[in-house]
């Protein structure tokens, strides 16, 4: 009986789910980077005030609220730069500062703010009614520009610097926005990793064999071992020569085969029993058969000229009685 065991095949994961997970993992870092770059809208503030001096000079202050690096600052009056305005000063972080009259002094206050002093003649100066604009070029936000003018009701020396509340509020908004985006990204990544880790194992396909197949597979090794053990007893007697025994028997086949019980040939014996069973010699078989004939009262056929009669272990009297003396 031949039985074939089918190995259950593993069901491959769904391609759509795996592809979607891969695309999400690749798109997420780019989304986080874009949100971090664009978090917090950049802003430019401009302040114009009149100093209480003999010449009544004007001071222009500009600042940039953003996370990018500033590469160039341009200050103009009469309108935005390139739209009818006149350039007063150009400030570069590495190449230095260039200014034109009536600008008297331009300098960097911080890395994101500058100041410019203009010479004037008080309230009648044309600078009092004009508009000043500051343009910041930054990376990666780009160019941002804002304009401002002197308030009409401002008195010399009473113009106060801008309150830091809007500046601080813009900085906090940018910091909190970036932090929130990073925190959300980390939580989302952990969620994806945990979901991928706890994904259920692939399901096994049910075997198509009959219910008796496992039982047949279980009995197959035992039947093979029993077939190996069912070996005739005569196969281990390699020292016996059937031709010699047939020659010694004048009446046909050897009688010692018939004397053995028939069920011994089908009795399974283990390897240890075979190894411990001694292989009988030719003389021992003849002795056993002679003893059997002696018990039956007949002359043993193995007492020819080529064979030697071994004495019976019961003594000479037992041999002389049935056989007689010739």
UniProtKB/Swiss-Prot annotation:
Its main location: membrane. Residues 296-326 are annotated as: Disordered. It is found in: Cell membrane. GO terms for molecular function: phosphatase binding; signaling receptor activity. The modification Phosphotyrosine is found at residue 233. GO terms for biological process: negative regulation of T cell receptor signaling pathway. Keywords: Cell membrane, Membrane, Phosphoprotein, Receptor, Transmembrane, Transmembrane helix. Induction: In T-cells, up-regulated by activation induced by treatment with anti-CD3 and anti-CD28 antibodies. GO terms for cellular component: plasma membrane. Pfam families: Ig_PVRIG (PF25456). It is a multi-pass membrane protein. Expressed in some types of immune cells. Expressed at low levels on the surface of freshly isolated T-cells and natural killer (NK) cells, predominantly on CD8+ T-cells (mainly memory/effector, but not naive cells) and on both CD16+ and CD16- NK cells. T-cell expression levels are variable among individuals. Not detected in B-cells, naive or helper T-cells, monocytes, nor neutrophils (at protein level). Not detected in dendritic cells. The chain crosses the membrane at residues 26-46, 62-78, 172-192. Interacts with NECTIN2, hence competing with CD226. Was named PVRIG for the homology observed between its second exon and the variable immunoglobulin domain of the polio virus receptor (PVR/CD155) and polio virus receptor-like (PVRL) genes. Cell surface receptor for NECTIN2. May act as a coinhibitory receptor that suppresses T-cell receptor-mediated signals. Following interaction with NECTIN2, inhibits T-cell proliferation. Competes with CD226 for NECTIN2-binding. This is Transmembrane protein PVRIG. It comes from Homo sapiens (Human).
């Amino acid at each position: 009986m031949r039985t074939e065991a089918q190995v259950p095949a593993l069901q491959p994961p769904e391609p759509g789910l795996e592809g979607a997970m891969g695309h999400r993992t690749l798109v997420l870092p780019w989304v986080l980077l874009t949100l971090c770059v664009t978090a917090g809208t950049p802003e430019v503030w401009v302040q114009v005030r009149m100093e209480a001096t003999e010449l009544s000079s004007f001071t222009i202050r500009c600042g940039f609220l953003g996370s990018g690096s500033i590469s160039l600052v341009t200050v103009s009056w009469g309108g935005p730069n390139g739209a009818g305005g006149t350039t007063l000063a150009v400030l570069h972080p590495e190449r230095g500062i260039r200014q034109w009259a009536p600008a008297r002094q331009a300098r960097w206050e911080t890395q994101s703010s500058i100041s410019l002093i203009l010479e004037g003649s008080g309230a009648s100066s044309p600078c009092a009614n004009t508009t000043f604009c500051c343009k910041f070029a930054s990376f990666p936000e780009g160019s941002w520009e804002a304009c401002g003018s002197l308030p009409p009701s401002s008195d010399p020396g009473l113009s106060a610097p801008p309150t830091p509340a809007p500046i601080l509020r813009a900085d906090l908004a940018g910091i909190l926005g970036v932090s929130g985006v990073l925190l959300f990204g980390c939580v989302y990544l952990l969620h994806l990793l945990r979901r991928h880790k706890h994904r259920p194992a692939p399901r096994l396909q049910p075997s198509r064999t009959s219910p008796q197949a496992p039982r047949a597979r279980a009995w197959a090794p035992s039947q093979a071992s029993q077939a190996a053990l069912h070996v005739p007893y005569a196969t281990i007697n390699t020292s016996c020569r059937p031709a010699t025994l047939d020659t010694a028997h004048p009446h046909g086949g050897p009688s010692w085969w018939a004397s053995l019980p028939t069920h011994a040939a089908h009795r399974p014996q283990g390897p240890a029993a075979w190894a411990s069973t001694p292989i009988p010699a030719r003389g021992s078989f003849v002795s056993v058969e002679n003893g059997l004939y002696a018990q039956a009262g007949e002359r043993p056929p193995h007492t020819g000229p080529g064979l030697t009669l071994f004495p019976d272990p019961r003594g000479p009297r037992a041999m002389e009685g049935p056989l007689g003396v010739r």
